């Protein structure tokens, strides 16, 4: 999968860095999301866990080209969102 990142105009680095999330962590979540659902407008929201155990929310837009996405931002899940994710995961058969 090809992953492009929104670059922060101030730093020239991926916007995810502002939230303490690097490219490898985003790739790990997108490769095996626990949830992937529609977001606002054309975006999608992937929730998942990195190999290091961090739970992240990744906001992205699928590119017209198959197998390619544009990541807008990503950040760690807060305690309330993490509890909700775990509750939803328990309910699934």
Language model features: what each stretch is:
Residues 1-93:
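Ribonuclease/tRNase effector modules and their secretory precursors
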